Protein backbone atom coordinates (compact mmCIF):
# COMPACT_ATOMS: atom_id res chain seq x y z
CA UNK A 1 0.00 0.00 0.00
CA UNK A 2 2.87 2.35 0.79
CA UNK A 3 4.37 1.68 -2.64
CA UNK A 4 1.12 2.42 -4.45
CA UNK A 5 0.51 5.66 -2.57
CA UNK A 6 4.15 6.78 -2.91
CA UNK A 7 4.25 6.19 -6.68
CA UNK A 8 0.86 7.87 -7.11
CA UNK A 9 2.10 10.92 -5.20
CA UNK A 10 5.26 11.13 -7.32
CA UNK A 11 3.20 10.83 -10.52
CA UNK A 12 0.98 13.69 -9.35
CA UNK A 13 4.08 15.83 -8.95
CA UNK A 14 5.18 14.84 -12.47
CA UNK A 15 1.73 15.69 -13.86
CA UNK A 16 2.17 19.20 -12.54
CA UNK A 17 5.28 19.59 -14.70
CA UNK A 18 3.86 17.84 -17.79
CA UNK A 19 3.43 19.74 -21.07
CA UNK A 20 2.77 16.79 -23.42
CA UNK A 21 -0.75 15.41 -23.80
CA UNK A 22 0.54 11.89 -24.53
CA UNK A 23 2.83 11.93 -21.49
CA UNK A 24 -0.02 13.32 -19.38
CA UNK A 25 -2.36 10.52 -20.52
CA UNK A 26 0.25 7.81 -19.87
CA UNK A 27 1.03 9.15 -16.40
CA UNK A 28 -2.69 9.40 -15.63
CA UNK A 29 -3.19 5.74 -16.54
CA UNK A 30 -0.15 4.58 -14.55
CA UNK A 31 -1.40 6.59 -11.57
CA UNK A 32 -4.74 4.80 -11.72
CA UNK A 33 -3.01 1.42 -11.77
CA UNK A 34 -0.95 2.19 -8.66
CA UNK A 35 -4.01 3.66 -6.91
CA UNK A 36 -5.70 0.27 -7.28
CA UNK A 37 -3.22 -1.16 -4.78
CA UNK A 38 -4.93 0.70 -1.95
CA UNK A 39 -8.29 -1.00 -1.55
CA UNK A 40 -7.07 -4.60 -1.53
CA UNK A 41 -4.28 -3.78 0.94
CA UNK A 42 -6.74 -2.12 3.31
CA UNK A 43 -9.14 -5.05 3.16
CA UNK A 44 -6.36 -7.54 3.83
CA UNK A 45 -5.33 -5.46 6.84
CA UNK A 46 -8.90 -5.31 8.14
CA UNK A 47 -9.34 -9.07 7.78
CA UNK A 48 -6.09 -9.77 9.62
CA UNK A 49 -6.38 -7.29 12.47
CA UNK A 50 -10.07 -7.49 13.42
CA UNK A 51 -12.35 -10.38 14.36
CA UNK A 52 -15.50 -11.28 12.46
CA UNK A 53 -17.72 -9.58 15.05
CA UNK A 54 -15.89 -6.24 14.99
CA UNK A 55 -14.55 -6.07 11.43
CA UNK A 56 -17.79 -4.71 10.00
CA UNK A 57 -17.66 -1.53 12.09
CA UNK A 58 -14.17 -0.65 10.88
CA UNK A 59 -14.91 -1.79 7.34
CA UNK A 60 -17.92 0.53 7.16
CA UNK A 61 -15.91 3.58 8.17
CA UNK A 62 -13.15 2.57 5.76
CA UNK A 63 -15.68 2.16 2.92
CA UNK A 64 -16.73 5.78 3.34
CA UNK A 65 -13.15 7.06 3.23
CA UNK A 66 -13.02 7.44 -0.55
CA UNK A 67 -16.20 9.54 -0.51
CA UNK A 68 -14.76 11.74 2.22
CA UNK A 69 -11.46 11.97 0.34
CA UNK A 70 -13.24 12.99 -2.85
CA UNK A 71 -15.18 15.68 -1.01
CA UNK A 72 -12.01 17.07 0.57
CA UNK A 73 -10.28 16.93 -2.80
CA UNK A 74 -12.99 18.99 -4.47
CA UNK A 75 -12.70 21.61 -1.73
CA UNK A 76 -8.94 21.74 -1.13
CA UNK A 77 -7.64 21.14 -4.65
CA UNK A 78 -10.24 23.46 -6.15
CA UNK A 79 -9.13 26.18 -3.74
CA UNK A 80 -5.47 25.68 -4.65
CA UNK A 81 -6.23 25.68 -8.39
CA UNK A 82 -8.38 28.81 -8.16
CA UNK A 83 -5.55 30.71 -6.44
CA UNK A 84 -2.37 29.25 -7.96
CA UNK A 85 -3.39 27.46 -11.19
CA UNK A 86 -4.03 23.86 -12.23
CA UNK A 87 -0.42 22.70 -11.97
CA UNK A 88 -0.35 23.51 -8.27
CA UNK A 89 -3.43 21.35 -7.82
CA UNK A 90 -1.29 18.34 -8.76
CA UNK A 91 1.60 19.60 -6.64
CA UNK A 92 -0.66 19.91 -3.60
CA UNK A 93 -2.16 16.45 -4.11
CA UNK A 94 1.32 15.00 -4.56
CA UNK A 95 2.60 16.50 -1.32
CA UNK A 96 -0.41 15.20 0.61
CA UNK A 97 0.19 11.78 -0.97
CA UNK A 98 3.82 11.78 0.16
CA UNK A 99 2.72 12.58 3.70
CA UNK A 100 0.11 9.81 3.51
CA UNK A 101 2.71 7.30 2.28
CA UNK A 102 4.94 8.17 5.23
CA UNK A 103 2.06 7.67 7.68
CA UNK A 104 1.08 4.33 6.12
CA UNK A 105 4.69 3.10 6.13
CA UNK A 106 5.04 3.99 9.80
CA UNK A 107 1.72 2.78 11.21
CA UNK A 108 0.15 0.22 8.82
CA UNK A 109 1.51 -3.20 9.82
CA UNK A 110 1.06 -6.40 7.84
CA UNK A 111 -0.55 -8.58 10.50
CA UNK A 112 -0.74 -9.08 14.27
CA UNK A 113 1.90 -11.81 13.95
CA UNK A 114 4.35 -9.34 12.39
CA UNK A 115 4.23 -7.32 15.63
CA UNK A 116 4.37 -10.29 17.98
CA UNK A 117 0.62 -10.62 18.63
CA UNK A 118 -1.44 -13.80 18.17
CA UNK A 119 -3.56 -14.01 15.00
CA UNK A 120 -7.27 -13.15 15.17
CA UNK A 121 -10.10 -15.46 14.07
CA UNK A 122 -8.03 -18.50 15.07
CA UNK A 123 -9.25 -20.99 17.73
CA UNK A 124 -7.68 -20.51 21.16
CA UNK A 125 -6.05 -23.92 21.02
CA UNK A 126 -4.40 -23.01 17.71
CA UNK A 127 -2.71 -19.64 18.04
CA UNK A 128 0.11 -20.57 15.69
CA UNK A 129 -0.36 -21.45 12.05
CA UNK A 130 1.52 -24.04 10.04
CA UNK A 131 3.89 -23.04 7.27
CA UNK A 132 1.55 -24.40 4.62
CA UNK A 133 -1.32 -22.29 5.99
CA UNK A 134 0.68 -19.09 5.96
CA UNK A 135 2.54 -19.46 2.67
CA UNK A 136 0.11 -21.01 0.19
CA UNK A 137 -1.40 -17.70 -0.90
CA UNK A 138 -1.70 -18.67 -4.56
CA UNK A 139 -3.84 -21.68 -3.72
CA UNK A 140 -6.12 -19.57 -1.54
CA UNK A 141 -6.53 -16.95 -4.25
CA UNK A 142 -7.36 -19.60 -6.85
CA UNK A 143 -9.89 -21.00 -4.40
CA UNK A 144 -11.65 -17.62 -4.29
CA UNK A 145 -12.18 -17.74 -8.06
CA UNK A 146 -13.92 -21.12 -7.76
CA UNK A 147 -16.10 -20.33 -4.73
CA UNK A 148 -19.76 -20.17 -5.88
CA UNK A 149 -20.69 -17.87 -2.99
CA UNK A 150 -18.10 -15.27 -4.06
CA UNK A 151 -19.33 -15.39 -7.67
CA UNK A 152 -22.96 -15.02 -6.57
CA UNK A 153 -22.06 -12.07 -4.35
CA UNK A 154 -20.24 -10.53 -7.31
CA UNK A 155 -23.43 -10.83 -9.39
CA UNK A 156 -25.50 -9.35 -6.57
CA UNK A 157 -23.11 -6.43 -6.27
CA UNK A 158 -23.07 -5.93 -10.06
CA UNK A 159 -26.86 -5.56 -10.15
CA UNK A 160 -26.73 -3.25 -7.13
CA UNK A 161 -24.19 -1.08 -8.96
CA UNK A 162 -26.55 -0.91 -11.94
CA UNK A 163 -29.22 0.71 -9.77
CA UNK A 164 -26.64 2.86 -7.99
CA UNK A 165 -25.10 4.38 -11.09
CA UNK A 166 -28.46 4.56 -12.86
CA UNK A 167 -29.55 7.19 -10.36
CA UNK A 168 -26.12 8.83 -10.14
CA UNK A 169 -25.71 9.10 -13.92
CA UNK A 170 -29.28 9.58 -15.12
CA UNK A 171 -31.23 10.76 -12.07
CA UNK A 172 -31.06 14.48 -12.84
CA UNK A 173 -32.01 13.91 -16.48
CA UNK A 174 -34.89 11.64 -15.43
CA UNK A 175 -36.32 14.23 -13.05
CA UNK A 176 -36.10 16.92 -15.72
CA UNK A 177 -37.45 14.91 -18.66
CA UNK A 178 -40.04 12.76 -16.89
CA UNK A 179 -41.23 14.83 -13.95
CA UNK A 180 -40.56 18.38 -15.09
CA UNK A 181 -38.14 19.52 -12.39
CA UNK A 182 -35.73 22.37 -12.99
CA UNK A 183 -32.05 21.46 -13.25
CA UNK A 184 -31.31 23.04 -9.87
CA UNK A 185 -34.10 21.22 -8.04
CA UNK A 186 -33.29 17.93 -9.75
CA UNK A 187 -29.62 18.22 -8.84
CA UNK A 188 -30.47 19.02 -5.23
CA UNK A 189 -32.74 15.98 -4.92
CA UNK A 190 -30.12 13.61 -6.34
CA UNK A 191 -27.42 15.12 -4.11
CA UNK A 192 -29.43 13.99 -1.09
CA UNK A 193 -28.67 10.37 -1.98
CA UNK A 194 -24.92 11.07 -2.04
CA UNK A 195 -24.93 12.54 1.46
CA UNK A 196 -27.10 9.75 2.84
CA UNK A 197 -24.92 7.21 1.05
CA UNK A 198 -21.89 8.30 3.06
CA UNK A 199 -23.90 8.04 6.29
CA UNK A 200 -25.19 4.59 5.36
CA UNK A 201 -21.73 3.31 4.48
CA UNK A 202 -20.11 4.67 7.63
CA UNK A 203 -22.62 3.05 9.97
CA UNK A 204 -23.31 -0.14 8.00
CA UNK A 205 -20.71 -2.17 9.85
CA UNK A 206 -21.82 -0.84 13.23
CA UNK A 207 -25.39 -1.91 12.40
CA UNK A 208 -24.35 -5.47 11.56
CA UNK A 209 -21.86 -5.81 14.42
CA UNK A 210 -23.93 -4.29 17.23
CA UNK A 211 -27.49 -5.16 16.19
CA UNK A 212 -27.01 -8.47 14.37
CA UNK A 213 -23.95 -9.98 16.07
CA UNK A 214 -21.71 -9.68 13.03
CA UNK A 215 -24.23 -11.22 10.62
CA UNK A 216 -24.49 -9.37 7.31
CA UNK A 217 -27.30 -11.30 5.60
CA UNK A 218 -30.23 -9.82 7.55
CA UNK A 219 -29.26 -6.13 7.17
CA UNK A 220 -28.29 -6.80 3.54
CA UNK A 221 -31.84 -8.07 2.92
CA UNK A 222 -33.43 -5.16 4.79
CA UNK A 223 -31.49 -2.50 2.94
CA UNK A 224 -31.78 -4.35 -0.36
CA UNK A 225 -35.56 -4.15 -0.04
CA UNK A 226 -35.17 -0.51 1.04
CA UNK A 227 -33.33 0.11 -2.23
CA UNK A 228 -36.17 -1.50 -4.21
CA UNK A 229 -38.79 0.55 -2.34
CA UNK A 230 -36.87 3.78 -2.92
CA UNK A 231 -36.61 3.15 -6.66
CA UNK A 232 -40.33 2.36 -6.86
CA UNK A 233 -41.18 5.65 -5.13
CA UNK A 234 -38.75 7.53 -7.34
CA UNK A 235 -39.71 5.98 -10.68
CA UNK A 236 -43.35 4.93 -10.44
CA UNK A 237 -44.96 7.99 -8.83
CA UNK A 238 -45.56 10.54 -11.62
CA UNK A 239 -45.47 14.31 -11.33
CA UNK A 240 -43.60 16.78 -9.15
CA UNK A 241 -43.71 15.64 -5.51
CA UNK A 242 -40.62 17.26 -4.06
CA UNK A 243 -40.79 15.81 -0.57
CA UNK A 244 -41.70 12.32 -1.78
CA UNK A 245 -38.76 12.30 -4.19
CA UNK A 246 -36.51 13.64 -1.43
CA UNK A 247 -37.63 10.82 0.89
CA UNK A 248 -37.01 8.34 -1.93
CA UNK A 249 -33.44 9.63 -2.28
CA UNK A 250 -32.89 9.45 1.49
CA UNK A 251 -33.94 5.79 1.46
CA UNK A 252 -31.98 5.13 -1.73
CA UNK A 253 -28.82 6.73 -0.37
CA UNK A 254 -28.97 4.88 2.95
CA UNK A 255 -29.77 1.59 1.22
CA UNK A 256 -27.04 1.88 -1.39
CA UNK A 257 -24.55 3.10 1.23
CA UNK A 258 -25.07 -0.02 3.33
CA UNK A 259 -25.11 -2.35 0.31
CA UNK A 260 -21.85 -0.90 -1.02
CA UNK A 261 -20.25 -2.03 2.22
CA UNK A 262 -21.92 -5.46 2.44
CA UNK A 263 -22.37 -6.65 -1.15
CA UNK A 264 -19.48 -4.56 -2.44
CA UNK A 265 -16.91 -6.40 -0.37
CA UNK A 266 -17.52 -7.15 3.31
CA UNK A 267 -19.67 -10.26 2.83
CA UNK A 268 -17.11 -11.67 0.38
CA UNK A 269 -14.26 -10.89 2.77
CA UNK A 270 -16.12 -12.64 5.60
CA UNK A 271 -16.39 -15.94 3.71
CA UNK A 272 -13.10 -15.89 1.80
CA UNK A 273 -9.94 -17.55 3.15
CA UNK A 274 -8.14 -15.16 5.47
CA UNK A 275 -5.09 -14.86 3.22
CA UNK A 276 -7.18 -14.21 0.11
CA UNK A 277 -9.50 -11.43 1.27
CA UNK A 278 -7.93 -9.00 -1.20
CA UNK A 279 -8.64 -11.38 -4.06
CA UNK A 280 -12.27 -11.69 -2.94
CA UNK A 281 -12.65 -7.92 -2.96
CA UNK A 282 -11.06 -7.82 -6.41
CA UNK A 283 -13.54 -10.31 -7.87
CA UNK A 284 -16.51 -8.41 -6.47
CA UNK A 285 -15.05 -5.05 -7.49
CA UNK A 286 -14.46 -6.08 -11.10
CA UNK A 287 -17.99 -7.45 -11.42
CA UNK A 288 -19.43 -4.32 -9.81
CA UNK A 289 -17.81 -1.91 -12.22
CA UNK A 290 -18.62 -4.10 -15.20
CA UNK A 291 -22.24 -3.78 -14.09
CA UNK A 292 -21.86 -0.01 -13.73
CA UNK A 293 -20.37 0.26 -17.22
CA UNK A 294 -23.05 -1.90 -18.83
CA UNK A 295 -25.68 0.18 -17.08
CA UNK A 296 -24.53 3.36 -18.80
CA UNK A 297 -24.67 1.67 -22.21
CA UNK A 298 -28.01 -0.06 -21.65
CA UNK A 299 -29.67 2.99 -20.11
CA UNK A 300 -28.48 5.19 -22.95
CA UNK A 301 -29.80 2.74 -25.55
CA UNK A 302 -33.17 2.37 -23.81
CA UNK A 303 -33.62 6.12 -23.33
CA UNK A 304 -32.61 7.06 -26.86
CA UNK A 305 -34.50 4.12 -28.38
CA UNK A 306 -37.79 5.24 -26.85
CA UNK A 307 -37.54 8.92 -27.68
CA UNK A 308 -40.11 10.57 -29.93
CA UNK A 309 -40.47 14.07 -31.32
CA UNK A 310 -43.82 15.75 -30.73
CA UNK A 311 -44.36 19.27 -32.01
CA UNK A 312 -40.61 19.72 -32.15
CA UNK A 313 -40.15 18.63 -28.53
CA UNK A 314 -38.27 15.49 -27.46
CA UNK A 315 -40.49 13.17 -25.41
CA UNK A 316 -39.08 10.14 -23.61
CA UNK A 317 -40.82 6.92 -22.61
CA UNK A 318 -39.11 5.68 -19.45
CA UNK A 319 -41.21 2.51 -19.06
CA UNK A 320 -38.40 0.15 -20.01
CA UNK A 321 -35.88 2.14 -17.98
CA UNK A 322 -38.11 1.72 -14.93
CA UNK A 323 -38.18 -2.04 -15.43
CA UNK A 324 -34.43 -2.18 -15.99
CA UNK A 325 -33.47 -0.19 -12.91
CA UNK A 326 -36.01 -1.69 -10.50
CA UNK A 327 -35.44 -5.17 -11.92
CA UNK A 328 -31.71 -4.86 -11.29
CA UNK A 329 -32.35 -3.94 -7.65
CA UNK A 330 -34.66 -6.95 -7.25
CA UNK A 331 -32.11 -9.30 -8.83
CA UNK A 332 -29.47 -7.97 -6.45
CA UNK A 333 -31.66 -8.98 -3.49
CA UNK A 334 -32.39 -12.34 -5.11
CA UNK A 335 -28.73 -13.26 -5.56
CA UNK A 336 -27.86 -12.05 -2.05
CA UNK A 337 -30.45 -14.48 -0.66
CA UNK A 338 -28.61 -17.35 -2.35
CA UNK A 339 -25.65 -16.92 -0.02
CA UNK A 340 -27.72 -16.47 3.14
CA UNK A 341 -25.89 -19.21 5.05
CA UNK A 342 -22.49 -19.03 3.33
CA UNK A 343 -19.58 -19.65 5.69
CA UNK A 344 -15.84 -19.11 5.53
CA UNK A 345 -13.96 -21.92 3.84
Question: Predicted regions span which residues?
Answer:
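A membrane-interface helix-boundary motif in multi-pass transporters
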Residues: 82-94, 215-218, 301-329
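Juxtamembrane intracellular "pre-TM" segments in multi-pass secondary transporters
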Residues: 115-152, 178
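Structural signature of the two symmetry-related core transmembrane helices
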Residues: 1-13, 218-233
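Cytoplasmic helix-loop-helix junction between adjacent transmembrane helices
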Residues: 27-68
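Helix-breaking motifs and short loop linkers at transmembrane-helix boundaries and internal kinks
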Residues: 11, 17-22, 180, 237-239
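Helix-loop-helix hairpin linking two adjacent transmembrane segments in secondary transporters
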Residues: 62-113
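Extracytoplasmic gate region of multi-pass secondary transporters
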Residues: 147-204, 260, 295-299
Amino acid sequence: MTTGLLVTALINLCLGFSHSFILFAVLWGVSGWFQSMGAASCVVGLSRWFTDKERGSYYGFWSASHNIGEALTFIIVASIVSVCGWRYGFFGAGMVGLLGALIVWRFFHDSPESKGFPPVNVPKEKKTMSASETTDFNKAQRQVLTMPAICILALSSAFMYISRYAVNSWGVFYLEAQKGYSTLDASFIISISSVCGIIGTMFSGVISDKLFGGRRNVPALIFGLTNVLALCLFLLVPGVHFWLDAVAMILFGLGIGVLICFLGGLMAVDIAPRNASGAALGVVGIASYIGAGLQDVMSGVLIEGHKTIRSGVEVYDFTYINWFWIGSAILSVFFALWVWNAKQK
